[in-house]
A protein has these predicted regions:
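Blade-edge beta-strand/turn elements of extracellular beta-propeller
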Residues: 2-8
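Serine-hydrolase catalytic core recognition
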Residues: 7, 14-231
Length: 231
């Protein structure tokens, strides 16, 4: 029997099937719309029924951007993935802001609603002001395999930061950016990378904002740190 897809829209689904296997309930989101709950008959072409509506009228007034999903080759040959938010040509100012997600091992270059929804809305504001925004899944981000995940073993602020330097070269060459007008920011591990960028690569970034950053790993969560630094 030929298998046919039931859910085909761009985005992400989390699905539960009824005991009778005739109905599904699922959670669905896209890169610019948050998660909502739906039910549908389990057959191709079935019309879903939306159960929840979690956005406000104020939220729905905005034409929230869908990011461009890109990839490029780092200097060691590894493919790196990212989201790019680009302003319209008449607003573009040639400057850029690079965002560093937290935890090290998270993933943000995906097609569904990000846990970084506050930053997403901030990036939307930056784009309206003319800035290009890069949201990078740097080395050690989740979902790209063992070698990717362990690339920062015993050297946090090494290969992961290098990916931002390589990203800068790519963005300047392909998005008409001024290499002297690129800033970087992030929180937690993203704050740590921001500090490493400003302190060890000051010639690369015009400015940075390190939010709630880790500054001394010896006083951070031992279970997290020991797995990476192996002490």
């Amino acid at each position: 029997k030929e298998l046919k897809p039931v859910l085909e829209n761009e985005g992400a689904y989390e699905v539960s099937i009824s005991p009778s296997e005739s109905v599904i309930a699922y959670r669905y989101s896209t890169s610019n719309r948050p998660w909502e709950l739906y039910v549908s008959k389990l057959k191709p072409g079935a019309e879903p029924f939306q159960i929840t509506s979690s956005t406000t009228k104020e939220f729905d007034k905005h034409d929230w951007m869908k990011p461009e999903f890109i990839d490029f080759e780092a200097d060691d040959g590894t493919t790196i993935y990212a989201r790019v938010y680009e302003p319209k040509a008449d607003r573009k100012n040639g400057a850029a802001v690079f965002f560093v997600h937290g935890a090290g091992y998270l993933q943000n270059a995906h097609h569904f609603w990000s846990g970084y929804f506050r930053e997403y809305m901030f990036h939307h504001l930056l784009v309206e002001k003319g800035y290009t925004v890069l949201d990078l899944d740097y080395r050690a981000s989740d979902g790209y395999g063992r070698d990717y995940r362990t690339a920062i073993y015993r050297h946090m602020g090494g290969r992961d930061l290098d990916d931002y330097i390589d990203a800068k070269k790519f963005m300047v060459e392909n998005y008409d950016l001024d290499s002297n007008r690129i800033g970087i920011y992030g929180g937690s591990y993203g704050g740590f990378i921001t500090l490493m960028a400003l302190l060890t690569k000051p010639e690369e970034f015009a400015c940075g904002a390190a939010l709630r950053s880790v500054t001394d790993w010896s006083h951070y969560n031992h279970e997290y740190t020991s797995n990476i630094l192996n002490y």
